[in-house]
């Protein structure tokens, strides 16, 4: 059926072609000997064909008077006279200036143009026809700047829209076409060129100075605005090279704002590269920076990488984070937070981003804001806290879920005395057990605890109850050890724990500990502590780094990871450049069997007094000395996880032998102190008093059905063997790299035996998170579970901080 349908359509098209009265046909004048000449203008003759009862218009060939072209054959005399008058007025400049016109196809195109655009001048027609010789005709030159048509456009406008650079040159050089003439929409030739597909046309226009380059149309858009709106990156580049101005205000701001509004990354980058100040420009309507206009993570990231102020405010006082939350753009929110946006910034009416997020029914966004430091008890100008906003949500399920979310981190509900809230309500709420300020026994977290009266009052969420104001004595009599597990991107959990410790103590991690040991991701964080990088900064770095490093499939390219490490620690920085606190990173020497644990230190290694583990009957290259060891290489060696990254020379990930480096660090400290005593420097030795071990989160325990590997005798047993081998392999890897279990028990027992305070902080995660996880939502949820863990173990944190701050 489709075949017959196409056949019918084809036959219909052919029939119309031959029945078209305006079909141009080459004829001989001898065929019209018996016809009457009705009119004659130049080479055009209108003939009445008596036998056919038609009126034919014939263009006599200037080269051969006996031949010509029939332009139409009409049955109506009136129509024939009208069309003859039109043709006789428009055709002469063409057949007088170029022999190319005297072809059936060209004449057909030209006559169709004349009929379809009766208001066009001969110059407009010449542009569409595209024959250069025609532009030397005096009549065509005389109409070069004519705007007498329905659009009010000049022939130059048409040439630019068509993208015909050769015709453009003819118009400008021979016809002296003006480039600043506007059409009915206020658009110049530059606007038309932008809408075309040939950047060369725009480049030719820009060679001559013209006001049209920066002319605004009736919508207030310059050609640069229009190019940004349409995403014509190459057009933007040419306009900027032609010195188009970036600081002309349009209805939505500068061209950079237009590029951001329509998410045209390439256009925005072009503008910023030409004028870096545009990144800070404010639009006239909202007083918003380009970052406020970012609609996706890619656009926001591009601006922030180029130095855009992440906390710039609009006329209403809102930051870009406020706008991203209001528009429910979670990806933008995450980019802004990871680049250091203030999660507690007060905007219009005193609302923080968390106030706005409560009405969006987006749990991930609420979690992200709180995880990145948003205070849940901050009232706005109306005295409303985020929890009160949540309690006003009309959807009961959403309302309960949000309030339960707050309760998991210690939210208490009560009525503060503020204007507009009755004291009777306040006192009634204060007597409710859920609103009690006594936090010694918080109620169990369950939706069943949320009664109707719990949903109405103004809520005040948790305060860090264990914050201490005392500062530690710089001359401590004992040493403190911090140990950081390996775990890939789950190092974010360690960061969140360290942020809580810093917030509670008011002291940077670097000043709380004398020794820091780390494996893999823990090693990177140990170096970050050594080089005085804040944990809030590192949290953002980790979120940004994962998208750079974990691209493609495993094993990942090492280049992005190495570039990241060089960028953060310096390409030529040595381990011994910073000496306090003492830092050790674990690595696995894989150029020998059995493999050996190696420690990258920022101090000289203690001299060994014990016999070597193996007989050194082979020639092995000694490790690099700390003074010569590059920091970024040490971090790369410690984090060379097999199947994730290729080995760094002879080094594999330290997690193969010490994913929890606590016992190895304590052994190292003991050997270091013994070496100091042997060297007569026993007065410099300090006893270890506190060991803090931070994990990257415990994965949930799951049942394993089969780890049996045997010789199969049938297909069913073969499948069981394959499955068992897979599970067994996973179990072997997990056992080798397990940082919890007996490793923690042994460390705790050792510390208790020698009188050392031991703290193991490692939250239970709800799901198994891979080392190369890139989902923001998954990682934010892991940090949320860490926040819940911190609140539930607040007494342990309080005790730890008190001990760390004691002399």
Swiss-Prot record:
Gene: Pla2g6
Region (Calmodulin-binding (1-9-14 motif)): 678-687
Disruption phenotype: Knockout mice represent an appropriate model for studying the pathogenesis of neuroaxonal dystrophy in human neurodegenerative diseases. Mutant mice show neuroaxonal dystrophy and significant motor dysfunction from the age of 50 weeks that progressed to ataxia by 2 years. At 55 weeks they display numerous spheroids located in the axons and synapses throughout central and peripheral nervous system, mostly prominent in the tegmentum of the medulla, the lower pons, and the dorsal horns of the spinal cord. Sciatic nerves have reduced numbers of myelinated fibers indicative of neural degeneration.
Record SUPFAM superfamilies: Ankyrin repeat, FabD/lysophospholipase-like
CDD domains documented for this protein: Pat_PNPLA9 (cd07212)
Cell compartment(s), UniProt: Cytoplasm; Cell membrane; Mitochondrion; Cell projection, Pseudopodium
Gene Ontology MF annotations: 1-alkyl-2-acetylglycerophosphocholine esterase activity; calcium-independent phospholipase A2 activity; calmodulin binding; identical protein binding; long-chain fatty acyl-CoA hydrolase activity; lysophospholipase activity; serine hydrolase activity
Keyword flag Cell membrane: yes
Gene3D superfamilies, per the entry: Ankyrin repeat-containing domain, Cytosolic phospholipase A2 catalytic domain
Enzyme class: hydrolase
Active site (record annotation): 520, 653
Reported function: Calcium-independent phospholipase involved in phospholipid remodeling with implications in cellular membrane homeostasis, mitochondrial integrity and signal transduction. Hydrolyzes the ester bond of the fatty acyl group attached at sn-1 or sn-2 position of phospholipids (phospholipase A1 and A2 activity respectively), producing lysophospholipids that are used in deacylation-reacylation cycles.
PNPLA domain ranges (all copies): 482-666
GO annotation terms (biological process): antibacterial humoral response; cardiolipin acyl-chain remodeling; chemotaxis; phosphatidic acid metabolic process; phosphatidylcholine catabolic process; phosphatidylethanolamine catabolic process; platelet activating factor metabolic process; positive regulation of insulin secretion involved in cellular response to glucose stimulus
E.C. number: 3.1.1.4, 3.1.1.5, 3.1.2.2
Organism of provenance: Mus musculus (Mouse)
Residue spans of the ANK repeats: 120-147, 151-181, 185-215, 219-248, 251-281, 286-312, 316-345, 349-378, 382-403
Tissue expression as described in the entry: Expressed in neurons of central and peripheral nervous system. Highly expressed in Purkinje cells in cerebellum and dorsal and ventral horn neurons in the spinal cord. Expressed in testis (at protein level). Expressed in skeletal muscle (at protein level).
Protein's name according to its UniProt entry: 85/88 kDa calcium-independent phospholipase A2
GO cellular component, one term: mitochondrion
């Amino acid at each position: 059926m489709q075949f017959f349908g196409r056949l019918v359509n084809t036959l219909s098209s052919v029939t119309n072609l031959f029945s078209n009265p305006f079909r141009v046909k080459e004829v001989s004048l001898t065929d019209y000997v018996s016809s009457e000449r009705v009119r004659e203008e130049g080479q055009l003759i209108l003939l009445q064909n008596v036998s056919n009862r038609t009126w034919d218009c014939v263009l006599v060939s200037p080269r051969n008077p006996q031949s010509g072209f029939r332009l139409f054959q009409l049955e109506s005399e009136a129509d024939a006279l009208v069309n003859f008058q039109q043709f006789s007025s428009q055709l002469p400049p063409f057949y007088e200036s170029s022999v190319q016109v005297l072809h059936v196809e060209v004449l057909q195109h030209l006559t169709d143009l004349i009929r379809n655009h009766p208001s066009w001048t001969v110059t407009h027609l010449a542009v569409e026809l595209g024959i250069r010789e025609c532009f030397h005709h005096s009549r065509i030159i005389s109409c070069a700047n004519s705007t007498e048509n329905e659009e009010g456009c000049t022939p130059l406008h048409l040439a630019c829209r068509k993208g015909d650079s050769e015709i453009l040159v003819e118009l400008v050089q021979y016809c002296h076409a003006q480039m600043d003439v506007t059409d009915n929409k206020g658009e110049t030739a530059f606007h038309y060129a932008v809408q075309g597909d040939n950047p060369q046309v725009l480049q030719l226009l820009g060679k001559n100075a013209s006001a049209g380059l920066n002319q605004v149309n009736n919508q207030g858009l310059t050609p640069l605005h229009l190019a940004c709106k349409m995403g014509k990156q190459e057009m933007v580049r040419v306009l900027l090279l032609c010195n188009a101005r970036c600081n002309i205000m349009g209805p939505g701001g500068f061209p950079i704002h237009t590029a951001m509004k329509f998410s045209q990354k390439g256009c925005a980058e072009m503008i910023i590269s030409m004028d870096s100040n545009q990144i800070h420009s404010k639009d006239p309507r909202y007083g918003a920076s380009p970052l406020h206009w970012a609609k996706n993570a890619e656009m926001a990231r591009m601006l922030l990488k180029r130095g855009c102020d992440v906390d710039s405010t609009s006329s209403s006082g809102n930051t870009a984070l406020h706008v991203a939350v209001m528009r429910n753009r979670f990806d933008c929110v995450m980019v802004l937070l990871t680049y250091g946006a203030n999660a507690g910034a007060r905007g219009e009416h005193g609302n923080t981003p968390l106030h706005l997020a409560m009405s969006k029914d987006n749990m991930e966004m609420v979690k992200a804001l709180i995880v990145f430091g948003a205070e849940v008890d901050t009232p706005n100008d109306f005295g409303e806290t985020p929890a009160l906003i949540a309690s006003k949500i009309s959807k009961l399920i959403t309302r309960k879920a949000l309030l339960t979310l707050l309760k998991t981190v210690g939210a208490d509900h009560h009525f503060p005395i503020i204007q507009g809230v009755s004291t009777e309500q306040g006192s009634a709420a204060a007597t409710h057990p859920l609103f009690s300020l006594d936090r010694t026994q918080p109620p169990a977290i369950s939706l069943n605890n949320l009664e109707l009266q719990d949903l109405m009052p103004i809520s005040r969420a948790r305060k860090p109850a264990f914050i201490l104001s005392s500062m530690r004595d710089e001359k401590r009599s004992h040493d403190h050890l911090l140990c950081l597990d390996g775990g890939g991107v789950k190092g974010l959990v360690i960061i969140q724990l360290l942020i809580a410790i810093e917030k509670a103590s008011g002291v940077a991690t670097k000043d709380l500990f004398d020794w820091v040991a780390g494996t893999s991701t823990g090693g990177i964080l140990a170096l970050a502590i050594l080089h005085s990088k804040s944990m809030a900064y590192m949290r953002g770095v980790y979120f940004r780094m994962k998208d750079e490093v974990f691209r493609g499939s495993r094993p990942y390219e090492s280049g992005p990871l190495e570039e990241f490490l060089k960028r953060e620690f310096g390409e030529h920085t040595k381990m011994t450049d910073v000496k306090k606190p003492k830092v050790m990173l674990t690595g696995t020497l894989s150029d020998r069997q059995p493999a050996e644990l190696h420690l990258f230190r920022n101090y000289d290694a203690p001299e060994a007094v014990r016999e070597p583990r193996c007989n050194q009957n082979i020639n092995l290259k000694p490790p690099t000395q700390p003074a010569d060891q590059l920091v970024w290489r040490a971090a790369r060696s410690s984090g060379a996880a097999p199947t994730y990254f290729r080995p760094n020379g002879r080094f594999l990930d330290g997690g193969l032998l010490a994913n929890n480096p606590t016992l190895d660090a304590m052994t190292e400290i003991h050997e270091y102190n013994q070496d100091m005593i042997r060297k007569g420097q026993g007065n410099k030795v300090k006893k270890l008093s506190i060991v803090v071990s931070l994990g990257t989160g415990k994965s949930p325990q799951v049942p394993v059905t089969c780890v049996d590997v045997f010789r199969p005798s049938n297909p069913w047993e073969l499948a069981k063997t394959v499955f068992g081998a897979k599970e067994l392999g996973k179990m072997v890897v997990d056992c080798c790299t397990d940082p919890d279990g007996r490793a923690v028990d042994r460390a705790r027992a050792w510390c208790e035996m020698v009188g050392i305070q031991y703290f193991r902080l490692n939250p239970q995660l709800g799901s198994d998170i891979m080392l190369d996880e890139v989902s923001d939502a998954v990682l934010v949820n892991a940090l949320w579970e860490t926040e819940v863990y911190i609140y539930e173990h607040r007494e342990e944190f309080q005790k730890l901080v008190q001990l760390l701050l004691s002399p």
